[in-house]
């Protein structure tokens, strides 16, 4: 019988020492109104908690584990690297090798800087954009998350283009007011804004495939519009591919949609599950960063040899066997088509959206194109679906506004088991609609 007694006790103790008992808010399970399982180990497609429950994992550490948990080749590379020392604060050959592999996957990243997190990557990319253009204003889109730096933690009010209002206490109004938010997938709003004040904007930053309001692909022409207006007005286009990089395709969303950004931010998969992110782009722009140029960016643990080893091993496997990208996408297609078939069978309004190997099940009867669409989905039905799956060994993101992911270890048996549990969950929801 499914139970989380040990996890519940562990959570209560954790709350005494950490805010809310966690180190990232979504892990608290507050959005689904419960307590989280505390994880003890993971292997392949499976994750295990301290109550000895086993789950098929579709969170995959929020995306990084495309090779599955504890990939033997990645683990072996770490076991070999750790005895040589865990941090030097000095250049290593590994850094250059990783940069070369990243560039091979994404040629737009001509010069690359290694950092420790996606937040560092986006924060630094914005500083570079502002320093390079000599402008202060940036544009982001409602529902796109780019880390928790002050300039990006803002929300929109009413109107076409809203100058930033802080989305968290502690974010100064003066910092946020240079951030302009627009609706995702709204090309007309972008054009209108740039017609009015385009020559004052340093950059647009965008998730080319939104993943932080659930999986929301770009509408045809949207990314093209961003590229067109930024070029016309001397602003930079920054792709935040922290989530969709290596998920949308082998070369990220920029390859899938054939759009070349000025700067790209990567994380998650690029570190193979370790704290590592990168940002990079055109040589002329990136060479403005110290010590090559005047724009300052630094980090004590940037290029950490253990994290770089993990990333290098992961990218080496993906480079050696590019069929992995098709395999994980095919598995995602099979899974999502199964969800759609079952939901239709039980007359449960569901829209399943996916790009590459990332997906979200939205409990709604219309396609989700922006944050307002996502926010209008049925949260109670999501909770029913989520809890039935969790209690039957299927581990999804504990929020209706998150993406889920598939790894190379999710074989046909895992897909079949997942769909069998989904069948039960959709039937349960259907019974409430009678």
Regions found by a protein language model. Give the residues of each.
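Conserved N-terminal phosphate-binding loop of PLP-dependent enzymes in the Aspartate aminotransferase
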Residues: 1-434
């Amino acid at each position: 019988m499914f139970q989380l007694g040990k996890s519940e006790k562990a959570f209560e103790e954790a709350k005494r020492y950490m805010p809310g008992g966690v180190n990232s808010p979504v892990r608290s399970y507050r959005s689904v109104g419960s307590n989280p399982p505390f994880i003890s180990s993971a292997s392949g497609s499976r994750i295990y908690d301290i109550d000895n429950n086993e789950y098929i994992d579709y969170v995959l550490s929020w995306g990084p584990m495309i090779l599955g948990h504890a990939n033997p080749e990645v683990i072996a590379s770490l076991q070999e690297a750790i005895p040589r020392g865990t941090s030097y604060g000095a250049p290593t050959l590994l850094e250059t090798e990783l940069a070369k592999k990243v560039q091979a996957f994404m040629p737009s990243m001509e010069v690359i800087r290694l950092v420790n997190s996606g937040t560092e990557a986006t924060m630094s990319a914005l500083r570079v954009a502002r320093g390079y253009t000599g402008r202060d204003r940036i544009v982001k889109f409602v529902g796109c998350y780019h880390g928790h730096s002050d300039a990006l933690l803002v929300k929109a009010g009413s109107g076409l283009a809203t100058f930033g209002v802080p989305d968290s206490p502690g974010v100064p109004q003066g910092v946020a007011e240079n951030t302009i938010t627009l609706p995702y997938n709204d090309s007309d709003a972008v054009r209108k804004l740039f017609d009015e004040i385009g020559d004052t904007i340093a950059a647009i930053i965008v998730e080319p495939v939104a993943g932080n309001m659930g999986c929301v692909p770009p509408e045809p022409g949207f990314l093209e519009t961003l590229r067109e207006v930024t070029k016309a007005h001397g602003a930079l286009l920054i792709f935040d591919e922290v989530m969709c990089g290596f998920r949308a395709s082998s070369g990220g969303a920029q390859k899938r949609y054939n759009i070349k950004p000025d700067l790209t931010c990567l994380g998650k998969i690029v570190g193979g599950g370790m704290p590592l992110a990168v940002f990079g782009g055109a040589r002329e722009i990136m060479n403005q960063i110290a010590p090559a140029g005047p724009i300052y960016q630094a980090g004590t643990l940037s290029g950490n040899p253990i994290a770089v080893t993990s990333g290098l091993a992961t990218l080496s496997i993906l480079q050696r066997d590019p069929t992995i990208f098709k395999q994980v996408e095919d598995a995602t297609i099979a899974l999502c088509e199964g969800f759609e078939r079952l939901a239709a069978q039980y007359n449960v309004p569901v829209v399943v959206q996916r790009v590459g190997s990332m997906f979200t099940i939205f409990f709604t009867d219309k396609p989700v194109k922006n944050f307002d669409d996502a926010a209008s989905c049925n949260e109670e039905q999501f909770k029913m679906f989520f809890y039935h799956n969790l209690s039957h060994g299927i581990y999804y993101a504990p929020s209706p506004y998150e993406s889920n992911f598939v790894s190379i270890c999710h074989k046909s048996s895992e897909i079949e088991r997942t769909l069998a549990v989904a069948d039960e969950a959709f039937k349960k929801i259907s019974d409430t609609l009678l």
